[in-house]
C-alpha cells in the first residue's frame, strides 16, 4: 500500500471506530415506496421524493421527449451555447409558480447556494445563518469571506442580538460601500422537519435593513397554495429577496434554483461562479421539473399533496412536514437501530455526524404520498420494536 493510501486507510479506520464510516449502497430500482438493494426489496422511508413523482409517467414522458429533441447533454455552459430551451421554459415556469420576476436554475441545490451567496457577499459583508441550515449554506458562507455569525436554531432573541451587532458594524467606511447583512434560513429544516418563524424573521430583517434568503427545498411542492412553499403560506414571499430550492425532492427531478427579482437573476448570471463555470444541467431533468411544477398546480397534484398530509397525520398529528426525526444520540446505537429495521425489510439509514451534530444521531423518517396506509402502519410497528 502506498503512503498516500495508508494515510487515508488510517483515517477511514478512525471513522469506523467512531461509528461514522459510511458506504454506498447500490439501488437496483426506481425511487418509490419500495426499493431494491442487494437483491432484497425494502419498504423505503428515506427518500425525499415526497409526492412520488420521480418515477411518475408524466415526468418520464417529458424527460424522454426532451432527450429525443435536445439529446443527453447540453454540451456547454449556459453562457456559451448550452442555454437550451428546456432551461428557459423551466425558469419561466418557476418564476410564475413562485410569483417572482425571474428564476435561475443550477446543476444542484448546493451549487445554487454556493454561487448565490458568494456572488452577493464579500469580506466586508455580514452573513447570519440559523445553526441548523444545510451544509451547502454553511460552506457558501465560509467561502464568501463575509463575517459569519450563527444564531441558535429558530431563536429570534439570539437573531436580534446578532442583528444589533451587525447594524453597528455595517456602517460605510471612507471610500467603501456599506456592508450588507444577509440572513439565511431554511423554511422546513432538512434533518429536524420543523418550520422557521418566517414572519418574525421578516420583521427583524426589515427592522435592521438586512436581506433575507430562504431555502424552501423541503417545503416546495408540499406546503402553501399549490405547494409554493412556507413563505407563500405565511404571506411573506414578497418580502424574501432570495428564494432558493431544489428540483430533486417533491418535484421528483434534479437541480437547484433561485427565484427573485429580474435584477437578482441578471446579476447571478454574471457573477455566480457555480453557474458560469458549469456545463448546463441535463435538459431531460429540466423538462421533467417543468412537468412536475405544472402537475402540482393541477387538481391531481392537489390530491397528491393532500394524500401526503394524510400519511403524515396518520403517523402523528404533531409534525409540520414529511420529515420525522427519531432521535437516538449515540452513533453506534443509531447504526444498530437502522440495521435492526433492515432486518424487518424497512430501509431508514442512520444519520450521523457530520450531517448532524455529534451526539444527535438519528433515524430520519420521510413519508411520501406513494406510501399506503398499510405501509405506514408497518413502519409504526417496526419502530416500536426498537425499544423492545
Task: Enumerate the language-model features and the residues they cover.
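Conserved PLP-anchoring active-site segment centered on the Schiff-base-forming lysine
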Residues: 116-135
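Conserved active-site segment immediately N-terminal to the catalytic lysine
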Residues: 209, 229-247, 266-270
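PLP-dependent aminotransferase class I/II
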Residues: 244-246, 250-319
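N-terminal "arm"/small-domain region of PLP-dependent enzymes with the aminotransferase-like
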Residues: 8-10, 14-70, 210
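Conserved PLP-binding catalytic core of the aspartate aminotransferase-like
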Residues: 304-345, 355, 359-360, 367-369
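Active-site phosphate-binding strand-loop segment of PLP-dependent enzymes
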Residues: 149, 153-214
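PLP-dependent enzyme catalytic core of the Aspartate aminotransferase-like
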Residues: 57, 61-65, 69, 96, ...
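Conserved N-terminal alpha-helix of the aminotransferase class I/II PLP-enzyme fold
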Residues: 61, 65-109
Amino acid at each position: 500500500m502506498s503512503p498516500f493510501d495508508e494515510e487515508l486507510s488510517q483515517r477511514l479506520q478512525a471513522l469506523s471506530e467512531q461509528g461514522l464510516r459510511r458506504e454506498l449502497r447500490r439501488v437496483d430500482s426506481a425511487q418509490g415506496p419500495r426499493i431494491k438493494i442487494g437483491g432484497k426489496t425494502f419498504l423505503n422511508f428515506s427518500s425525499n421524493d415526497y409526492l412520488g413523482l420521480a418515477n411518475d409517467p408524466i415526468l418520464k414522458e417529458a424527460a424522454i421527449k426532451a432527450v429525443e429533441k435536445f439529446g443527453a447533454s447540453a454540451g456547454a455552459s449556459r453562457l456559451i451555447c448550452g442555454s437550451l430551451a428546456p432551461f428557459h421554459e423551466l425558469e419561466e415556469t418557476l418564476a410564475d409558480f413562485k410569483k417572482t420576476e425571474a428564476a435561475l436554475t443550477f446543476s444542484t441545490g448546493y451549487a445554487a447556494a454556493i454561487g448565490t451567496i458568494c456572488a452577493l457577499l464579500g469580506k466586508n459583508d455580514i452573513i447570519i445563518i440559523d445553526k441548523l441550515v444545510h451544509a451547502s449554506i454553511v460552506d457558501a458562507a465560509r467561502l464568501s469571506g463575509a463575517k459569519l455569525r450563527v444564531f441558535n436554531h429558530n431563536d429570534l432573541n439570539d437573531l436580534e442580538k446578532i442583528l444589533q451587532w451587525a447594524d453597528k458594524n455595517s456602517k460605510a467606511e471612507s471610500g467603501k460601500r456599506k456592508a450588507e447583512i444577509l440572513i439565511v434560513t431554511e423554511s422546513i429544516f432538512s434533518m429536524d422537519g420543523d418550520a422557521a418563524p418566517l414572519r418574525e424573521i421578516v420583521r427583524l430583517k426589515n427592522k435592521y435593513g438586512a436581506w433575507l434568503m430562504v431555502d424552501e427545498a423541503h417545503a416546495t411542492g408540499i406546503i402553501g397554495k399549490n405547494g409554493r412553499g412556507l413563505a407563500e403560506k405565511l404571506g411573506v414571499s414578497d418580502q424574501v429577496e432570495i428564494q432558493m430550492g431544489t428540483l430533486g425532492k417533491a418535484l421528483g427531478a434534479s437541480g437547484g434554483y433561485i427565484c427573485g427579482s429580474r435584477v437578482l437573476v441578471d446579476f447571478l448570471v454574471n457573477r455566480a461562479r457555480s453557474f458560469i463555470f458549469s456545463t448546463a444541467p441535463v435538459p431531460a431533468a429540466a423538462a421533467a421539473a417543468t412537468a412536475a411544477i405544472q402537475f402540482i398546480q393541477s387538481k391531481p397534484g392537489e390530491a397528491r399533496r393532500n394524500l401526503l398530509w394524510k400519511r403524515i397525520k396518520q403517523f402523528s398529528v404533531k409534525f409540520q412536514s414529511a420529515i420525522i426525526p427519531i432521535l437516538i444520540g449515540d452513533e453506534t446505537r443509531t447504526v444498530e437501530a437502522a440495521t435492526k429495521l433492515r432486518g424487518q425489510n424497512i430501509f431508514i439509514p442512520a444519520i450521523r455526524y457530520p450531517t448532524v451534530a455529534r451526539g444527535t444521531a438519528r433515524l430520519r423518517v420521510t413519508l411520501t404520498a406513494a406510501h399506503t396506509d398499510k405501509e405506514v402502519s408497518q413502519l409504526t410497528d417496526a419502530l416500536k420494536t426498537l425499544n423492545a
